Amino acid sequence: KVYGRCELAAAMKRLGLDNYRGYSLGNWVCAAKFESNFNTHATNRNTDGSTDYGILQINSRWWCNDGRTPGSRNLCHIPCSALLSSDITASVNCAKKIVSDGNGMNAWVAWRNRCKGTDVNAWTRGCRL
């Protein structure tokens, strides 16, 4: 599923991401835009053999199990396929664990490069939330 900007903001808010660990909703919407272009089915292979999955491009080396990543930790205790669902609950729950891990949203390279330090409120502007 490819979410609309405001549709995704509403879903993320409903699932408790707004101001989770101090990150406003705009940060999460911005991260999803530049990680997956709001597409829940996005997958990208990395040079180390791991793969990033779903709307927030969650990595199989640390966070989920795809059965093909050597030394996978699966810290969210989920199959990576769960992160490709049109229902973003699994992705959001895992993202909460990731953002609580010490580096905050810096864990997402696209957030660090494209969202951090910008006016992220623009991502939720005009949305009925």
UniProtKB/Swiss-Prot annotation:
Function: Lysozymes have primarily a bacteriolytic function; those in tissues and body fluids are associated with the monocyte-macrophage system and enhance the activity of immunoagents.
PROSITE patterns noted in UniProt: GLYCOSYL_HYDROL_F22_1 (PS00128), GLYCOSYL_HYDROL_F22_2 (PS51348)
Active site: 35, 52
This protein's record includes keyword Signal: no
Broad EC category: hydrolase
Description of how the protein assembles with itself and partners: Monomer.
Residues in the signal sequence: none
GO BP, one annotated term: defense response to Gram-negative bacterium
Domain C-type lysozyme: 1-129
Known EC number: 3.2.1.17
Protein name: Lysozyme C
The reaction(s) this protein catalyses: Hydrolysis of (1->4)-beta-linkages between N-acetylmuramic acid and N-acetyl-D-glucosamine residues in a peptidoglycan and between N-acetyl-D-glucosamine residues in chitodextrins
Family: Belongs to the glycosyl hydrolase 22 family.
Disulphide-bonded residues: 6-127, 30-115, 64-80, 76-94
Main location per the UniProt record: secreted
Localization: Secreted
GO cellular component terms given for this protein: extracellular region
